[in-house]
């Protein structure tokens, strides 16, 4: 058995199955020639539904947050920035929902798997880059500005919520990486900035890439056949759905907390 950890055998211990732990890198590069199947196409649709739910979590929570920010006139600029992000996210989500797999791939059995994966992977990468910027603004400078301009932390996100934001994002990034690298799709436009930057820093710092817990550094093993891709893709759908549910729960807890604080202030007046 290989010593290096791969996505298939370790994503924070969630893919806990021997069929993932015992995979070897194939000698020949044939992943991009795999055929699409109706079953895999159905799972790709499931991935879009999960990602749409992920985006909807942000849209719903940010709309609530924007409403509460109206109560702090000193945060007008920050509120405007969030409104811009929500518009972008809503457009992305609407585009994702409108994507018709059946129309794009009417004959799955005569289509290469990578032909179906590339459009979705490209779309996810574009969305991920936007979410990277949003998450940074939402969890770092905005949190500081709230305290600086309101002199309290009533509108700050909880530490648990920030952890959930980062953890869920990391898993969606790793999923996008898996979609691409498991099929050995090599194209400059399919590189992920956060993954490339993490690798660069790890190499400069002398990190052992063969033995690391960093999710972005764990190697993705190319799949050997369509069935293997189908099984792992289905596992990913479950993992991402669970992560999205956890994020939604933390967002809702913050919304309830904000509501309770402002309701109490009304009662005290």
Curated annotation (Swiss-Prot):
Gene3D superfamilies: She2 domain. It is found in: Cytoplasm; Nucleus. The keyword Membrane does not apply. SUPFAM superfamilies: RNA-binding protein She2p. One of its GO terms (cellular component) is nucleus. InterPro entries: RNA-bd_She2 (IPR024261), She2_dom_sf (IPR036827). One of its GO terms (molecular function) is RNA binding. Keywords: Cytoplasm, mRNA transport, Nucleus, RNA-binding, Transport. It comes from the Eukaryota. GO terms for biological process: mRNA transport. RNA-binding protein that binds specific mRNAs including the ASH1 mRNA, coding for a repressor of the HO endonuclease. Part of the mRNA localization machinery that restricts accumulation of certain proteins to the bud and in the daughter cell. Homodimer and homotetramer. Belongs to the SHE2 family. This is SWI5-dependent HO expression protein 2. The gene is SHE2.
């Amino acid at each position: 058995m290989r010593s290096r950890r791969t996505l298939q055998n370790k994503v924070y211990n969630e893919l806990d199955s021997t069929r993932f732990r015992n995979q070897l890198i194939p000698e020949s590069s044939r992943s991009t020639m795999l055929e699409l199947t109706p079953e895999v196409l159905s799972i790709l649709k499931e991935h879009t539904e999960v990602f749409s739910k992920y985006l909807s979590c942000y849209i719903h929570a940010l709309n609530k947050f924007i409403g509460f920010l109206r109560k702090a006139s000193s945060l007008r600029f920050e509120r405007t920035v969030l409104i811009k992000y929500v518009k972008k996210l809503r457009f992305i989500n609407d585009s994702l929902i409108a994507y018709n797999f059946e129309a794009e791939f009417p004959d799955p059995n005569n289509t290469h798997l990578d032909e179906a994966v590339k459009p979705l992977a490209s779309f996810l990468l574009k969305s991920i880059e936007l979410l990277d910027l949003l998450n940074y603004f939402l969890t770092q400078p905005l949190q500081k500005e709230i305290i600086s301009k309101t002199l309290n932390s009533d509108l700050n996100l909880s530490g648990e919520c920030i952890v959930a934001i980062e953890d869920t994002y990391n898993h969606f990034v790793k999923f996008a990486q898996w979609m691409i690298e498991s099929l050995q799709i090599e194209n400059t436009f399919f590189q992920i900035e956060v993954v490339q930057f993490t690798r660069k820093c790890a190499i400069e710092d002398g990190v052992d890439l063969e033995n690391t817990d960093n999710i972005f550094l764990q190697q993705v093993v190319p799949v050997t056949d369509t069935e293997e891709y189908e099984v792992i893709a289905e596992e990913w759908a479950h993992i991402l759905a669970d992560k999205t549910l956890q994020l939604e729960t933390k967002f809702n807890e913050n919304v309830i907390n904000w509501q309770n604080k402002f309701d109490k202030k009304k009662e005290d007046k």
